[in-house]
A protein has these predicted regions:
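Acyltransferase donor/substrate-recognition loop-hinge adjacent to the catalytic core
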Residues: 84-165, 189, 202
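Acyl-donor binding region in acyl/amide transferases
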Residues: 17-103, 217-240
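Feature marks short, surface-exposed loop/turn motifs that line or immediately flank catalytic pockets
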Residues: 12, 62-66, 114, 210-212
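Short, mixed-charge, low-aromatic patches
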Residues: 2-3, 46-53, 102-111, 130-135, ...
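A conserved beta-strand-loop-helix scaffold within acyl/acetyltransferase catalytic domains
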Residues: 1-17, 137-240
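Short alpha-helix boundary/capping motifs
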Residues: 77, 122-123, 180-184
Length: 240
């Protein structure tokens, strides 16, 4: 019987960027047994030491688009599909093993009114005029024809650079993410901001929440899981 799993990762670009010698652990799951969690992380530590690493950090993935962090509160809240879920005992195991929190990831829930408050509209107009910005919607044809797929990920690389543990995505990774994610996004929920020269300076992407649909599907596409997902994506007023 499988009682735990973990991945050991050395992100050399991140280590070079942040001048670290760290081995990452990610995709960690274990039963509520201190011996199991210790055995998993002992293996990661040993593997990292063999390769010259001096510290262990996690949960982290290969890039910032992989799942990161560990849930420590809000267990009673319905999270987004991309949020890590783990049982409360996970963080207790980490603390017993000597791990300390190094960064916070915080998820917010905002209630969007049917009509935007006039104050928001007024401030938005002032900012657009002051910095000479233009807001546009992305068209499917522009992803390739005007290279907006590449521009969006170049912007993410630049904007995310100061974030904890970030390492810039390679061109190969960018190509894969463009192929994987952009066809799934409802472009009506994507907004772009460009400066006076037409250069992309900001992007905002919203997606319908699939959490309730995944619960109804019980995590499976068949026999009828696909129906709940399609309904959430295209036929139901979205919760974003």
């Amino acid at each position: 019987k499988v009682v735990g799993r973990v991945a050991a990762i050395i992100n050399r670009r991140a280590n070079e960027t942040w001048n670290k010698k760290e081995v990452r652990f990610g995709w960690i799951d274990f039963v509520d047994d201190p011996e199991v969690s210790k055995a998993l992380l002992d293996q990661v530590e040993a593997w990292g030491k063999e390769r010259g690493m001096e510290a262990m950090v996690g949960p982290l993935g290969f890039t910032d688009l992989d799942a990161e962090g560990m849930l420590v509160e809000g267990f009673d809240q319905l999270s987004t599909m991309s949020t890590i879920y783990n049982y409360p005992y996970y963080s207790q195991h980490m603390e017993r093993l000597g791990f300390e929190k190094e960064a916070d990831w915080v998820e917010f829930k905002l209630t969007v009114p049917d009509k935007l408050p006039e104050k928001f509209v007024r401030i938005s107009e002032i900012i657009l005029q002051k910095y000479k910005l233009k807001i546009k919607k992305l068209k499917r044809s522009e992803i390739k024809e005007k290279n907006y797929g590449q521009k969006i990920f170049d912007l993410i690389n630049e904007a995310y650079a100061p974030l904890y543990g970030y390492s810039k995505m390679t061109q190969g990774q960018i190509n894969q993410y463009i192929k994987t994610y952009l066809p799934l996004i409802d472009l009506r929920m994507v907004s772009l901001a460009a400066d006076e020269a037409g250069e992309l300076v900001a992007v905002g992407i919203s997606m319908p929440s699939l959490s309730e649909a995944l619960q109804k599907a019980k995590g499976k596409m068949l026999p009828f899981g696909w129906y709940h997902l399609l309904k959430a994506l295209f036929f139901k007023k979205p919760k974003v």
